[in-house]
């Protein structure tokens, strides 16, 4: 840490009125590019317009201008998010059975969408209980609203209006910070100040205010709701905030105010800041008092973290110093030069952020079911399945995006002349070793993971169950995973003496938690079947990484095309006369990586869906006997590929296939339509450009004959455009098919 004298002068960090506001300019399509602004000559123009509209690098090479555009666009994004949130809350206020659900969350299912009877589609309004007819929703909003203490639809209305106001404010901010007071480049590059403000402000004060809301509003309201008090009788949020006696009736230590805090007698607050672990048996969610305690602790950590970096006061850490001091015995210059990369290349910065956020999103997916945070979430199986699936897909897309922007950084922003012997240079210099080893790992994992299944299918087909890998024949128990489970299950009596129960029921040990006769959570047993499918996970993840990492490491050059950097991020082939050089651009690696990401995530969500229905979700009778949805068939059925096809895909597709004529019929139509969208993608992926150009010229001839030829000359999609359209429909079709399949199934049986 270096201590310097404070800097005397205050820097002016904005430019006033840098860009005039012009509706005329915005109304001209392609105004950001000289070529596009001329208007269309061929139909390729509209595709280029879409490809380049947000590629700010192609509009200008001025880093300050690019930074301002990105900054301004972020406000636009936030505006759309507020608008979307407002819509969610408005539906909750206007079209939902929220108040009915609040009074009986175990028997009434959440609905916030009512179909209007225009052409007879009111069949979609199913009976969700309590005399309400609508579409069952699986977003988890009702559970979040209850956890935050919302007790009436009027409160939802007010929040929806508030979100609209914020959406307008964000739109204004986006305009203001580009056209009226635009930050200078130095402001965008002041990482220490940015870290301090984001850590202390967004994460620190954000968590603190949420903890405050939970203690003063959520906890008392949920206390009343759990006790069965009618939501209309519960005092309103402002009454709890203004009247301390109300809170003191529920939590006596509130009568003492802040005295225990300042006298360091903090244990007084243990009534509402707890450390219990496990789930609340009434709601099947984490203890809300644990959650409040967690947010208070997080707030303290981030408030401290937000005061660690050196800004105007000459005290604290400098990021450049930290990075340059980071050298290991095998890393040459280490992190030297990374500071310059990350402050001048937003692609490099974005790649890191996407990789971390994508990984974090996948971690969230796994926590949402193993530590369900909201009341009555764990017993809403449709919502549990939707939240897991949603966060897995999002995480997958973000990680592929990380590779895409890392490759764009390599092509556009990497300067080989200034990088020597730092970490990145060393990785690039032994990229052949990295990729060939990774390739070997993929081959090993692929043959061995599928080999285990093929062995089982063969033995099963030949009627030799005693020779299969299964829990009842040749066992392949996941011993390391079971050891980890056991360690965590025993933690409260060993490594975490302060906790009453382990962090998650899934570890084992404790009994189950059931709410209203439905299982919320219980210890999840792992066996041979999980061992097999986990190696498929390892295989698909490694192949995805192989494709993406090869795209990044060979983005600038390869033995095949040494001057790849000059060809750009996306190009079809290395020009005429060089056969075998197609599909080598960094863009093509992202394109291929998307398919493997889709493979990887599909296996994960299939595994989760079946495992939970087989071993966790189900009903419990008065004697305490649990009946699982698919009766524990995962362990014996999922050990063959035939079992996956027969007992998962086919058996569980019966609900979506037989949904016609019921309130689930929309899922049947989506299932069909999404299959069609997926199949449509193959037309783009399997066909060559010349085929379409010939067909188009034939059609243009016919138009000319009839004197109806358009002024804009029709062109076949370029190779890259065709692939982009193909992969988009492939993913959209595949994801929507899975969505319809999962929801029709789980809403029918859950």
Swiss-Prot record:
PsaA and PsaB bind P700, the primary electron donor of photosystem I (PSI), as well as the electron acceptors A0, A1 and FX. PSI is a plastocyanin-ferredoxin oxidoreductase, converting photonic excitation into a charge separation, which transfers an electron from the donor P700 chlorophyll pair to the spectroscopically characterized acceptors A0, A1, FX, FA and FB in turn. Oxidized P700 is reduced on the lumenal side of the thylakoid membrane by plastocyanin. [4Fe-4S] cluster binds at residues 573, 582. The PsaA/B heterodimer binds the P700 chlorophyll special pair and subsequent electron acceptors. PSI consists of a core antenna complex that captures photons, and an electron transfer chain that converts photonic excitation into a charge separation. The eukaryotic PSI reaction center is composed of at least 11 subunits. GO terms for cellular component: chloroplast thylakoid membrane; photosystem I. The gene is psaA. Phylloquinone binds at residue 692. This is Photosystem I P700 chlorophyll a apoprotein A1. PROSITE patterns: PHOTOSYSTEM_I_PSAAB. Pfam families: PsaA_PsaB (PF00223). Chlorophyll a binds at residues 683, 691. The lineage of its organism: Eukaryota, Viridiplantae, Streptophyta, Embryophyta, Tracheophyta. P700 is a chlorophyll a/chlorophyll a' dimer, A0 is one or more chlorophyll a, A1 is one or both phylloquinones and FX is a shared 4Fe-4S iron-sulfur center.
């Amino acid at each position: 840490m270096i201590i310097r004298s404070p800097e005397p002068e205050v820097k002016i960090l904005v430019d006033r009125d840098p860009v005039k506001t012009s509706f005329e300019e915005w109304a001209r399509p392609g105004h950001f590019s000289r070529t596009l602004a001329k208007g269309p000559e061929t139909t390729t123009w509209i595709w280029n317009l879409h490809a380049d509209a947000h590629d700010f690098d192609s509009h200008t090479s001025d880093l300050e201008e690019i930074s301002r555009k990105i900054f301004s666009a972020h406000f636009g994004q936030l505006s759309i998010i507020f608008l979307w949130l407002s819509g969610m809350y408005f539906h909750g206020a206007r079209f939902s059975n929220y108040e009915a659900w609040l009074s009986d969350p175990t028997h009434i299912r959440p609905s916030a969408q009512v179909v209007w009877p225009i052409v007879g589609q009111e069949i979609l309004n199913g009976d969700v209980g309590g005399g309400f007819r609508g579409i069952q929703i699986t977003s988890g909003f009702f559970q979040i609203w209850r956890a935050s203490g919302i007790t009436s639809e009027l409160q939802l209305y007010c929040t929806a209006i508030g979100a609209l106001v914020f959406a307008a404010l964000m739109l204004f901010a986006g305009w203001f910070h580009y056209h009226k007071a635009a930050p200078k480049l130095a402001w965008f590059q002041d990482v220490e100040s940015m870290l301090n403000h984001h850590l202390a402000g967004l994460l620190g004060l954000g968590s603190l205010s949420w903890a405050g809301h939970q203690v003063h509003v959520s906890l008392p309201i949920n206390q009343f709701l759990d006790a069965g008090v009618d939501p209309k009788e519960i005092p309103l949020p402002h009454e709890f905030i203004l009247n301390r006696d109300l809170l003191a009736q529920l939590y006596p230590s509130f009568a003492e105010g802040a005295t225990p805090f300042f006298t360091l007698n903090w244990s007084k607050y243990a009534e509402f800041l707890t450390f219990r672990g496990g789930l609340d048996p009434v709601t099947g969610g984490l203890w809300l008092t644990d959650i409040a305690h967690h947010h208070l602790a997080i707030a303290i950590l981030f408030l401290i973290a937000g005061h660690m970096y050196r800004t105007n006061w000459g005290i604290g850490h400098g990021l450049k110093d930290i990075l340059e001091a980071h050298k290991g015995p095998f890393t040459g210059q280490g992190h030297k030069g990374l500071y310059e990369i990350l402050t001048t290349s937003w692609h490099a910065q974005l790649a890191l952020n996407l990789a971390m956020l994508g990984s974090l999103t996948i971690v969230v997916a796994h926590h949402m079911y193993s530590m369900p945070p909201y009341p009555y979430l764990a017993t809403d199986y449709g919502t549990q399945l939707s939240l897991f699936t949603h966060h897995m897909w999002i995480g997958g897309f973000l990680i592929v995006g990380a590779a895409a922007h890392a490759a764009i950084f390599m092509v556009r922003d990497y300067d080989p002349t200034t990088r020597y012997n730092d970490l990145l240079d060393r990785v690039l210099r032994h990229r052949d070793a990295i990729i060939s080893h990774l390739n070997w790992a993929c081959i090993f994992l692929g043959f061995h993971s599928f080999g285990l299944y093929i062995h089982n299918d063969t033995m099963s087909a030949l009627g030799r169950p005693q020779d299969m890998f299964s829990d009842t024949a040749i066992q392949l128990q996941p011993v390391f995973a079971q050891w980890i489970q056991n360690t965590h299950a025993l933690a409260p009596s060993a490594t975490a003496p302060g906790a009453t129960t382990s962090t998650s029921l899934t570890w084992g040990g404790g009994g189950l938690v059931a709410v209203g006769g439905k299982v919320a959570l219980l210890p999840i047993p792992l066996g041979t079947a999980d061992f097999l499918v986990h190696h498929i996970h390892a295989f698909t993840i490694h192949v995805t990484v192989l494709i993406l990492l090869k795209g990044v490491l060979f983005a600038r050059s390869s033995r095949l095309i040494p001057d790849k950097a000059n060809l750009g991020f996306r190009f079809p082939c290395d020009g005429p006369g060089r056969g075998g050089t197609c599909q080598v651009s960094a863009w093509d690696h992202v394109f291929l990586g998307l398919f493997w990401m889709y493979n990887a995530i599909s296996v994960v969500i299939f595994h989760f869906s079946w495992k939970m229905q087989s071993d966790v979700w189900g009903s419990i009778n008065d004697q305490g006997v649990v009946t699982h949805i698919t009766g524990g068939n995962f362990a014996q059925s999922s050990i063959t590929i035939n079992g996956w096809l027969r007992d998962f895909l086919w058996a569980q597709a019966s609900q979506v296939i037989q949904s016609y004529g019921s309130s689930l019929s929309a899922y049947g139509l989506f299932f069909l339509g999404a299959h069609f969208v997926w199949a449509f993608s193959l037309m783009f992926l399997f066909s060559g450009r010349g085929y379409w150009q010939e067909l188009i010229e034939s059609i243009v001839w016919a138009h000319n004959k009839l004197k109806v030829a358009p002024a804009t000359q029709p062109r076949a999609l370029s190779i890259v455009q065709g692939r982009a359209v193909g992969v988009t429909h492939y993913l959209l079709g595949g994801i929507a098919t899975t969505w319809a399949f999962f929801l029709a199934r789980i809403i029918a049986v859950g």
